[in-house]
């Protein structure tokens, strides 16, 4: 990302560490958010003092032309403003996609309609009890991208991944776990088929050396 202009959409909890990481590496960052400067309060001043540009308000997605655009997890990648930016040459990505690219250790990821957080937490606790150094994150805990510099190859990253995070993923974890599938988030996904397709991305890019675990008691995952 060096020498590239970067836009980060959303200045929420999940993206603030990403913004600060990019700024710490002297990358040109524009943070975009629907909130007003008044709503952001002191956070707006803090980011600007670190060299971050702000693009705020109802038109926060207008005119995106940065080299790389990080979308917030719950945002569809095919919004007209984003597809227009991609057509102009921007690369659309997310914090989790970049994490998969740079994380030096093996990754275990959990998705599903129910039980994701419980399953992810149990896996992390079992590995810790076995003496492993575990990094817990994704849709649970806190963003892990800023911690990759301190991760070792022998560590394990345990991740909870939502359908929104998985929609555009081009990488899969070493171990993928799907708890179950049932109609969910259809206010964002076009239909149940798209929701299932997003979930399938957790194992789509696995190799013969990787492991996929499914719930045989769920009619959809059993197929």
Predicted feature residues:
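N-terminal leader/targeting and accessory segments in enzymes
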Residues: 1-94, 98
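Phosphate-binding loop of NTP-binding sites
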Residues: 61-66, 73-223
């Amino acid at each position: 990302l060096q020498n590239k202009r970067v836009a980060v959409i959303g200045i929420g909890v999940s993206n603030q560490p990403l913004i600060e990481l990019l700024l710490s590496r002297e990358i040109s960052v524009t943070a975009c958010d629907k909130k007003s400067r008044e709503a952001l309060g002191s956070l707006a001043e803090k980011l600007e003092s670190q060299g971050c540009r702000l693009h705020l308000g109802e038109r926060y997605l207008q005119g995106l032309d940065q080299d790389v655009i990080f979308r917030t997890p719950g945002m569809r990648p095919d919004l007209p403003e984003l597809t227009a930016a991609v057509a102009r040459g921007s690369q659309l990505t997310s914090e989790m996609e970049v994490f998969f690219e740079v994380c030096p250790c093996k990754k275990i990821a959990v998705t599903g309609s129910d039980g994701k957080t419980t399953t992810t937490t149990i896996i992390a606790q079992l590995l810790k009890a076995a003496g492993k150094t575990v990094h817990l994150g994704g849709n649970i805990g806190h963003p892990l991208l800023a911690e990759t510099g301190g991760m070792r190859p022998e560590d394990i990253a345990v991740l909870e991944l939502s359908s929104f995070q998985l929609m555009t993923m081009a990488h899969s974890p070493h171990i993928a776990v799907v708890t179950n599938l049932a109609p969910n988030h259809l206010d964002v996904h076009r239909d149940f088929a798209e929701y299932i397709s997003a979930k399938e991305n957790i194992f789509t890019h696995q190799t013969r050396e990787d492991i996929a675990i499914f719930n045989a008691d769920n009619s959809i995952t059993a197929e």
